[in-house]
């Protein structure tokens, strides 16, 4: 049977017969007739990323405030940095204290830093 003869035979089939043919081919050859999803174009990827819910956040120390020592202590607790490293980070504000963390962890860090007197932003 040639390809043209097969095409003619397929054209003469009903929708139910075509469905049965597809199922038989899938079973016989161990394949799936699922439609492959093409990757979106570069412009579409940016739009899709904007629609997706953000899952990673950065905690940014914007301003130390009046109580610098308490903010340094809070930074040390959150980051496990040494005293000098935490002090340098606080003095370099605005600075990311935690990066790529979950929403819950970012909120907890923000509360701890604000309780110490700092101004914090989550991005």
From Swiss-Prot:
Subunit (UniProt): Homodimer. Part of the ribosomal stalk of the 50S ribosomal subunit. Forms a multimeric L10(L12)X complex, where L10 forms an elongated spine to which 2 to 4 L12 dimers bind in a sequential fashion. Binds GTP-bound translation factors.
Pfam families, alphabetized: Ribosomal_L12, Ribosomal_L12_N
Superkingdom of origin: Bacteria
Family: Belongs to the bacterial ribosomal protein bL12 family.
Coiled-coil parts of chain: none
Function description: Forms part of the ribosomal stalk which helps the ribosome interact with GTP-bound translation factors. Is thus essential for accurate translation.
A single GO BP: translation
Organism of derivation: Dehalococcoides mccartyi (strain ATCC BAA-2100 / JCM 16839 / KCTC 5957 / BAV1)
GO cellular component, one term: cytosolic large ribosomal subunit
Xref: NCBIfam families: L12
The protein's name: Large ribosomal subunit protein bL12
Ribonucleoprotein listed as a keyword: yes
A GO MF label: mRNA binding
Keywords tagged on the record: Ribonucleoprotein, Ribosomal protein
